[in-house]
Amino acid sequence: MTDFLEFDAYIRQGEPNQQKRAAIWRTAIGLQAVDGLQTSDYLKETAKKHIEGEIDIDEARQLIKTYYQSKATRGVINDDQCEADKVSANITKILSSISLDFSAKGFVALHRRIFDGVLKHAGEIRRYDITKKEWVLDADTVNYLNWEDLYRALEFDIEQERNFSYKNLSLEQQVVHIAQFVSGLWQIHPFGEGNTRTTAVFTILYLRHIGFNVENDLFAKHSWYFRNALVRANYKNAVKGIDYSPMYLERFFRNLLLGEQWDLRNRYLHISPSAEWKEQPNLGEKQSNEPQNEPQNEPQKFTSLSTRQQQILSLLSKDNSLSKQRLADALGLSMSTVKRELSAMSHMVKYVGPTKGGHWEIN
């Protein structure tokens, strides 16, 4: 979260153009959290130059490109940070415009623009089936669409939405429909990587297009919740007694579009939450005088962690016997990345006992 808090001063005190540019950068940077990525200090300094009007967005993107070309030559490149920086700059350019190609072709082109210079197959439909282990599903996966039907499914969903009328619907009904559309679009998962970030940017552009004001921090601060809510909206397991659960995504959009205050912490979305995380509260409602089961605040040591470290801590808090390999599998990370993150968390997480049969202790 500290990645984009540095832009607060521009949003509070800056000129209108500075406020707008800072808000867009916050959203672009915040969206990297869906894959546990964090931007570099160089990206933040470059963003500030753009916010202050010293350079335009294309110059900012070129500076970042040149910066990583230099690092690659020296063999000191951080691939995750490189992706986060370049994608953040690309998203900032896209969100700085109001144009939207609301079509399957436009959705695919948007993926290409977001991941230009990052992914080898940017803007290409995947030609293989995929599964993804999700920590919110206890390492189970959503059933994504098979690869043969991807483009037709995109065309169908977007055409259906194009022909849908919001006339005579209440705002609450509109929110429910928007959540259904976005959930279905994401479930197609047409690309090998970058589906959630593409869906988020497409959603922001579309909501603007149909008249909603989405110039706030919700996507910036809660992009990981957004992804997990999409997962829960598309997951069903009859054996475990779990049905599709769109209400979490609807609550995200209720906060975004209706100004409600649902507590958007990810632990409420887990399919097997502890007792204190079973009921997601609306913080905007008046609290009764009766004792409350839900926690009011997470410990500071938890909220001060990076998104990736929060994911690791959340998994270990549910199962302290997880091996590093199982953590890596559940989060879709490499073993080296997991080891590096655990090392950075050594002041609060330690492994006790033999290599096999030991457990993690959280201070």
Annotated model-derived regions:
Residues 1-363:
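FIC/Doc superfamily catalytic core
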